[in-house]
């Protein structure tokens, strides 16, 4: 397993302000949606569950959690070289992802305020948490001499349109996979404190509960719309979004093995644990999930990661554009083929097992 080479120098737009990472299929994206359609969602099927999730958000359990303590009042120059670059990359992508959620939720809250007050309040509270997370991570970046200009990101980033149904599927998965990423890393570092190289990780235990609560709200929202779980189309969409999220996660983790090694994690096993747990959690909301126990499942994901490494090496080469295109084509085909094979594997009927899922 070979990690993608990170640049030896980080590009800035002005002193101390890092230039945003180049947009690719793997970088966190900014989204917009059909706000009118969201405003017209009928929630009666899950009214009690949505109200319960809303009460959890109102409680704001982490109101005082994201306060930098004395552990941050020291130099982190010992984190240097490739480890420093990998860690800054991790922080930037995490910050961008959280800020992307903030922008979407803030706009949903604003647009729904006079049309769907309950949803508007929920999105306002979700935006509160995402802004808190993004700001905390951005301050962490400053410990390494850089930060992101979030206003600049707002203005310069490309916005991708997703229908509300896609937003519900993807945000639910994003929050739940975020929960597992944080809690598994926290548990690992709790057992192996020698690998805890930065105090941000100490916040992950409570932090991940924000992700969990956000996911619970989107689960209730998803289950309130029968078209998202009670039709044959919804079964295909569920598998599709699980697949795309898991492939993206696998490619991203394998690209950044240097970072995971720096905190004592085996990137391959970490990916297996995150994907397996997220898939099991998704069975509580989705009508179908992927069969992660299939012996070909993870080898196929890892084949996608290997092909992606080839694509990155080609992209970073000095070959002419036409030559690069020809060299990339077979590796792109490998990724597409492996994804098709995973998608066509026999899924797990979560709806049939609903009463057995904890």
From Swiss-Prot:
Keywords assigned: Chlorophyll biosynthesis, Iron, Metal-binding, NADP, Oxidoreductase, Photosynthesis
Cofactor(s) it depends on: Fe cation
InterPro entries, A to Z: AcsF, Ferritin-like_SF, Rr_diiron-bd_dom
GO BP field: chlorophyll biosynthetic process; light-independent chlorophyll biosynthetic process; photosynthesis
Entry EC number(s): 1.14.13.81
Record has Ligase as a keyword: no
Reaction catalyzed: Mg-protoporphyrin IX 13-monomethyl ester + 3 NADPH + 3 O2 + 2 H(+) = 3,8-divinyl protochlorophyllide a + 3 NADP(+) + 5 H2O
Pathway(s) served: Porphyrin-containing compound metabolism; chlorophyll biosynthesis (light-independent)
Domain of life the protein comes from: Bacteria
Keyword Iron: yes
GO molecular function, one term: iron ion binding
Protein family (similarity comment): Belongs to the AcsF family.
HAMAP family (UniProt xref): AcsF
Xref: NCBIfam families: AcsF (TIGR02029), PRK13654.1 (NF010172)
Job of this protein: Catalyzes the formation of the isocyclic ring in chlorophyll biosynthesis. Mediates the cyclase reaction, which results in the formation of divinylprotochlorophyllide (Pchlide) characteristic of all chlorophylls from magnesium-protoporphyrin IX 13-monomethyl ester (MgPMME).
Name the UniProt record assigns to this protein: Magnesium-protoporphyrin IX monomethyl ester [oxidative] cyclase 2
């Amino acid at each position: 397993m070979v990690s993608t080479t990170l640049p030896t120098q980080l590009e800035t737009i002005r002193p101390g302000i890092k230039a945003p990472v180049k947009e690719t299929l793997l970088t966190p994206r900014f989204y917009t949606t059909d706000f009118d359609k969201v405003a017209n969602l009928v929630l009666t099927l899950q009214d009690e569950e949505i109200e319960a999730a809303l009460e959890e958000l109102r409680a704001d359990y982490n109101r005082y959690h994201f306060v930098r303590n004395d552990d941050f009042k020291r130099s982190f120059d010992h984190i240097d070289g490739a480890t420093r670059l990998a860690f800054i990359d991790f922080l930037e992508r995490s910050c961008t992802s959280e800020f992307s959620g903030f922008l979407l939720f803030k706009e949903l809250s604003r647009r729904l305020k006079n049309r769907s007050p309950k949803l508007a309040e929920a999105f306002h509270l979700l935006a509160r948490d995402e802004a808190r997370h993004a700001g905390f991570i951005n301050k962490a970046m400053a410990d390494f001499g850089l930060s992101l200009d979030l206003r600049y990101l707002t203005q310069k980033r490309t916005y991708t349109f997703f229908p509300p149904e896609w937003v519900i599927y993807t945000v639910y998965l994003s929050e739940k996979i975020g929960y597992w990423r944080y809690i598994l890393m926290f548990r690992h570092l709790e057992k192996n404190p020698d690998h805890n190289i930065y105090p941000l990780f100490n916040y992950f235990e409570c932090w991940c509960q924000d992700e969990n609560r956000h996911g619970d709200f989107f689960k209730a929202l998803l289950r309130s719309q029968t078209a998202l779980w009670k039709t044959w189309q919804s079964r295909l969409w569920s598998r599709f979004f699980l697949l795309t999220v898991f492939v993206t996660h696998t490619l991203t983790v394998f690209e950044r093995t240097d970072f995971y090694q720096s905190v004592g994690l085996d990137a391959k096993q970490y990916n297996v644990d995150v994907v397996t747990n997220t898939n099991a959690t998704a069975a509580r909301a989705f009508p179908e999930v992927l069969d992660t126990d299939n012996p070909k499942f993870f080898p196929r994901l890892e084949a996608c990661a290997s092909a992606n490494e080839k694509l990155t090496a080609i992209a970073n080469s000095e070959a002419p554009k036409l030559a690069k295109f020809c060299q990339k084509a077979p590796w792109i085909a490998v990724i597409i083929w492996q994804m098709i094979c995973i998608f066509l594997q026999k899924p797990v009927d979560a709806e049939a097992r609903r009463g057995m899922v904890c």
